[in-house]
Swiss-Prot record:
It comes from Arabidopsis thaliana (Mouse-ear cress). This is Probable WRKY transcription factor 17. Disulfide bonds: none annotated. It is found in: Nucleus. It comes from the Eukaryota. Keywords: DNA-binding, Nucleus, Transcription, Transcription regulation. GO terms for molecular function: calmodulin binding; DNA-binding transcription factor activity; transcription cis-regulatory region binding.
Amino acid sequence: MTVDIMRLPKMEDQTAIQEAASQGLKSMEHLIRVLSNRPEERNVDCSEITDFTVSKFKKVISLLNRSGHARFRRGPVHSPPSSSVPPPVKVTTPAPTQISAPAPVSFVQANQQSVTLDFTRPSVFGAKTKSSEVVEFAKESFSVSSNSSFMSSAITGDGSVSKGSSIFLAPAPAVPVTSSGKPPLSGLPYRKRCFEHDHSEGFSGKISGSGNGKCHCKKSRKNRMKRTVRVPAVSAKIADIPPDEYSWRKYGQKPIKGSPHPRGYYKCSTFRGCPARKHVERALDDSTMLIVTYEGEHRHHQSTMQEHVTPSVSGLVFGSA
């Protein structure tokens, strides 16, 4: 679609422009004649003539800006000849270039001006120029020239490196292709196994999916010692439990399916930090009997040893000679 712009000025606008321009030119000539005379012969005020001249030229400018409004007309649409078969697209692939392997250790010193490396051209990697400061990255070595700064190089929008040192990158290792023809997803974490617990019986030996340095082997569940006894209930109250040689503190309860009496959970409060637990519930066959299940072992000897050692250590005074 073409658009033709046509300027059609009106006749009256052209006449007004010509009149204003002629008056402005005449007043400007008169002002020049007045200014060309000698100062003692000047009897006319030049400010009025100047204002009149400027006003006429301003009028000309306003008329020129106002005249000549554009009109748009839609031109004929030139449709290309339709063809049933599209033209064949010719695809050209660049010839493979031989990539030269970098030396294990290389220090290149250059005093000349550095050149620009364009990453879009495949033939740049095969040639090395002596006038550029080279930064090489290889699997076996990593060398940077002493006069170059890798961080100061600016990468332009087309992929070229300018105002810095040229870079020669080692070829990347081949990405393994799966049976479906697509490379594996890079977002999957590297699954590794903890070498400390590889042959340990205390761990399940399953591999972990996270890549941080902590061990994520699943610990096997310890078999706690459980002992169940049936004792007669002291009273009908749930909080009343038969006493034994230890003191217990209730820390929760849980309803039992099919029983109106909940199960109470207790932990040993004889010594702080004792891992022994027990839970008490009513027997389903006989409501006058209680089923007490003990879990864990009492560790009161270690707690008493710590209580005796702690005040003795705190009472020591270290003096300097």
